[in-house]
Regions:
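Membrane-interface "cap" regions at the ends of multi-pass membrane proteins
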Residues: 1-62, 72-77, 88-89, 437, ...
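C-terminal membrane-solvent junction of multi-pass transporters and transport-like membrane proteins
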Residues: 23, 348-359, 402-454, 487
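Hydrophobic, membrane-embedded alpha-helices of multi-pass small-molecule transporters
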Residues: 28-47, 68, 207-281, 306-330
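Extracellular loop-to-transmembrane helix junctions
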Residues: 46-141, 263-269, 273, 458-467
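TM-loop-TM module centered on a large, flexible mid-protein loop between adjacent transmembrane helices
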Residues: 94, 101, 132-137, 201-215, ...
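Hydrophobic alpha-helical segments and their helix-loop junctions in multi-pass secondary transporters
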Residues: 134, 173-211, 233, 275-282, ...
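Membrane-interface loop-to-helix entry segments
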Residues: 142-202, 237, 260-265, 398-407, ...
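A generic transmembrane alpha-helix motif of multi-pass inner-membrane proteins
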Residues: 391, 396, 400-401, 430-501
Length: 501
């Protein structure tokens, strides 16, 4: 079936067997969606966020976290409305496809693809740091640890949706229990003034340690707050993955908004507690945490000593594992949706004949993320790569996320303006102003991210990926499109109700 003249795209007829080989199973309710959203993010409360102390000090980190929370509130309320109105696995790509056409949908999906392929790679570097610290493995063997963890958690996601969601629920609850245990443990061991405020500014403008504390809340001023925004993103990054579970949700129009909003409320409370307590523990401090790959473990060690370091390390690993597991889930669905519609090679969207999970998409996505890690590792050398790979990958993931957020917020605004006829079971209380705030904060965050010296190293890989996939879509993909649920909805201008295949 050809498109009208001038569109430059062609839809190919497929038979019922095409969608039969790409079937998904409905399982998730509100609780499962909540666990999926919180689990995807929770690793950011265990590692990554703390690098912001080096650019903003404690007060800069707190205020940056608040600004980023506003951005995510605007985003999550927007996608809560869109996911109920367009309950398709495509999520960001689906929203942008309906609002901005095929190329808009493709580029939005590509931005989100960078986020979900690279974020597991970031998390596994933190996991490896914890494992090396606990077991005493020489960091030179880190690639082996990466491969082992990817293999285990891709397999868990492949062998059944119900198993995947049950694992997600269990490790998310354990992760939150670990954080609550740490909060309760930390409160009697706090010295906020001496340790949280122990960062000053040296002659070269870099952070220096104040042994007696008592420093400024904002040692780098307001510019330090803005420079800390990319690190604060790690406190909430990936909550937006929930709409990718739309076709595996029992009632996405009702449950998806509830799951997203409950997840965001949980994360805001946890983020505030960890930013307040982790650097305030006696013997830790903001300065030490500003370069730590295992901040929560540092806090637990300071409270309980080294005698139980193995047990404490295993406990501290849970949050990282929760996010690693759930983002591999999201990665598979994101690749699956673009492939099912023909934007990516269509073979990637075939689901497992028994378990009905997008196993090909998850395996290929994991292989790409792992390949990027190995290329960086061997091109830089083990010693240099060990100290920079986490930051390089984090910049790649955050840049992809920011572009995706801008596109999703723009899609929300356009759909509010141009598609008033679409049924909206849920409406964002923040409306268009919330979406505008998301765009503004995301643009500012990108602007300050560019100043990170590791940004250029990471963004070059992102540009290469964009060039390769844009060439594929321009030359091949757009001539092999399929009327998937996302495409059918967009083609009809939102008039065709969603139909499950």
């Amino acid at each position: 079936m050809a498109e009208p003249t001038g569109t430059g795209a062609t839809y190919q007829q497929v038979d019922a067997d095409y969608f039969a080989k790409r079937g998904l199973t409905r399982y998730a309710g509100v609780a499962s969606l909540w666990a999926l959203g919180v689990g995807a993010v929770i690793s950011g409360h265990f590692s990554g966020w703390n690098f912001g102390f080096a650019t903003g000090g404690w007060g800069g980190m707190l205020v940056a976290g608040m600004i980023i929370a506003v951005m995510y509130l605007g985003l999550t309320f927007s996608i809560a409305e869109m996911s109920a109105a367009l309950p398709h696995t495509g999520a960001a790509y689906s929203f942008a496809r309906t609002a901005m056409g095929r190329w808009g949908g493709f580029f939005t999906g590509l931005c989100e693809n960078v986020e979900y392929v690279i974020t597991p790679a970031v998390i596994v570097t933190f996991i490896t740091s914890y494992v090396n610290s606990i077991v005493g493995i020489d960091p030179i063997y880190s690639p082996i640890v990466w491969i082992v963890f990817f293999a285990i958690f891709v397999a868990l996601n492949v062998f059944g949706l119900e198993l995947s969601f049950k694992v997600t629920m269990v490790i998310t609850l354990i992760s939150l229990a670990v954080l609550i245990f740490f909060w309760i443990s930390a409160i009697p061991h706090m010295d906020f003034n001496k340790f949280a405020l122990n960062i000053g500014v040296g002659p070269d403008g870099a952070a220096v340690e104040l042994p007696d504390g008592g420093g400024s809340w904002f040692p780098f001023g307001f510019s330090g707050v803005l420079a800390t925004l990319p690190f604060a993103v790690w406190l909430f990054l990936a909550i937006e993955q929930l709409p990718l579970a739309a076709e595996e949700s029992v009632d996405p129009k009702r449950d998806m908004p509830k799951g997203i909003i409950l997840g965001m409320c949980t994360l805001m409370l946890s983020a505030f507690m960890i930013v307040l307590l982790n650097p305030s523990v006696i013997g830790v401090g903001s300065f030490k945490l500003s370069t730590s790959l295992e901040p929560l473990l540092d806090g637990l060690r300071a409270i309980y000593g080294d005698t139980g370091v193995v047990l404490l390390g295993v406990v501290a690993l849970t949050g990282l594992i929760a996010s690693f597991h759930t983002i591999i889930y999201a990665q598979g669905r994101q690749i699956y949706s673009l492939s099912r519609a023909g934007y990516f090679p269509r073979g990637l969207s075939v689901t497992h004949s028994k378990f009905k999970t997008p196993h090909v998409a998850m395996i290929v996505g994991a292989a790409v993320g792992l390949s990027v890690m190995l290329i960086i590792w061997f091109s830089l050398g083990a010693e240099q790569a060990g100290s920079t790979i986490g930051s390089v990958l984090l910049n790649m993931a955050v840049s992809g996320a920011m572009f995706s957020y801008i596109a999703q917020a723009a899609s929300f605004i356009l759909l509010r303006k141009n598609a008033t006829h679409i049924e909206r079971p849920y409406r964002s209380p923040l409306g268009v102003p919330g979406a505008v705030a998301t765009i503004v904060i995301a643009v500012v965050t990108l602007g300050y991210q560019v100043q990170d010296p590791n940004f250029t190293k990471g963004v070059l890989w992102v540009l290469v990926w964009f060039a390769v996939m844009t060439a594929y879509f321009g030359l091949v993909g757009r001539h092999k499109l399929v009327l998937s649920p996302e495409e059918k909805f967009a083609q009809s201008g939102g008039k065709d109700a969603y139909e499950s295949h």
